[in-house]
């Protein structure tokens, strides 16, 4: 019996977030430059496996099961910069599947260690930090090669509509309800673009006046989980015409704000959370009535060695 009030669940999968079991919204009080605009972080590390990608992994698998492409004892393969892989590994464990994940050796040690700890078969490759489509020796190419074997399935978070659908069904409704329908700006770092696409579409359907803002890192960045403009051209879920704003944040801006979030707000936010917040500060004006929600993708625990 799942009970979101008493927080009693039949299995760990019952803890996956949704409109009746949302991840928290926490107002920022010390790092914001505003007098009037209210800024909230949506703390996605409260998902059971620690990141916003838990939503995506769960829906990718559920969609595959519904389509009967995910079979009993299925062998899954997925290229990742860490968070999707960790969520897929743990959900696979709960359902009797297995996961092979090709990834870059530049992915933080904490993530690579946890993937192995969770039971994934980790294949470290000489790839860019975020898997690069078109790289013949990269993680995406390796996963595609493995998926051609008859006993493997690649869920393909970079093109699968089940990715944004997860956020259309959960993240968007959560934010609309948690802000009592008052959200004016939704801000998100760009990786696969599933979060901004699904959440943004839902919020725009509720009110066309909601501003959807996408934040990307500089070229040559070292922030896992987000993609530069050049890298974004490769994901099939990047729809910039649907955004009201798009802006770049530097490594230094992201890492500096990451430290401030931890040390001044006592929020254990990672660098991909900070990059989204830094972009919000650049794009959102200080006006009465502004209610800004920024996706804080995951915690700093997986990045401490690379931030400090």
Regions found by a protein language model. Give the residues of each.
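PLP-dependent amino-acid enzyme catalytic core
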Residues: 1-308
